[in-house]
Regions:
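Conformationally flexible catalytic loops at phosphate/diphosphate-handling active centers
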Residues: 5-92
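Short, flexible coil/turn micro-motifs enriched in small/turn-prone residues
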Residues: 1-3, 42, 102
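Hydrophobic transmembrane alpha-helix bundles
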Residues: 31-48, 129, 165-180, 219
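Single conserved hydrophobic/aromatic residue that forms the stacking wall/gate
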Residues: 1-11, 208-218
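Thiamine diphosphate
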Residues: 75-210, 214
Length: 219
């Protein structure tokens, strides 16, 4: 699952040429996939019923396929980077190499956070930002590799509200990563940008400069 804001940044800016992308596509595999897909040129009737005696097993059997996705995405991100000169990873870190306070989010607000990080690091603040490019499957290993070893406090921002839940999805994923591994970390969750409400540099700045997690939530 790749997250995009939609209206705000979903317009075409610089389209990559299909001929340049073609070497990255396994055309034989693509043809084989299409040969088994539904097509009005050779119609067929298919059912989707699975009996309860094997449904559970079928759902679990796909785990290996999903587990392989992060490495595949990382590989093709590197290949696209060779074409464009813009290299991305599943989790991109930006900021001070010895950051103690890090904000985690995804989508267009990352650019606002990036400018805020520039402003604060220029003044000697040890802060950073992690921009999530691949949310599902969530790769704990790639995530931890992106977090500076010096980090003491994480602020995880979600662009959704889950009424009744203990926290929003990205926040809970990050908490789970640290809890399962017994790694001590102060983690606070927050929300931003619902219904395209603007997120300002001043608001991001408060996440870094608030003296305590409780104050961060209030900001």
């Amino acid at each position: 699952l790749r997250m995009s804001r939609g209206l705000g940044d979903g317009y075409k800016r610089q389209a990559l040429d299909y001929d340049a992308l073609r070497p990255l596509v396994d055309m034989d595999a693509l043809k084989a996939f299409r040969a088994h897909s539904l097509n009005p040129e050779h119609p067929a009737t298919r059912g989707t019923t699975v009996n309860p005696d094997i449904f559970f097993q079928c759902r679990e059997a796909c785990n290996q396929k999903f587990a392989a996705i992060p490495e595949a995405v990382e590989h093709y991100m590197a290949e696209i980077g060779k074409l464009t000169g813009r290299t991305h990873h599943l989790f991109d870190y930006y900021g001070a190499p010895d950051a103690e306070r890090v904000v985690i989010l995804m989508g267009s607000a990352a650019e606002t956070a990036r400018e805020t990080v520039d402003y604060l690091t220029a003044r000697g603040e040890k802060v950073g930002l992690i921009n999530v490019h691949l949310y599902r499957p969530f790769s704990a290993e790639h995530f931890l590799a992106a977090v500076p070893a010096s980090c003491k406090r994480l602020a995880v921002l979600d662009r959704t509200k889950e009424p009744g839940a203990m926290g929003e999805p990205l926040y809970q994923d990050v908490c789970t990563v640290y809890q399962e591994r017994g790694i001590p970390m102060t983690i606070v969750g927050g929300r931003y940008g619902l219904s395209s409400k603007d997120t300002t540099p001043g608001q991001i700045c408060l996440l870094y400069t608030s003296p305590s997690p409780r104050d961060m939530r209030r900001s």
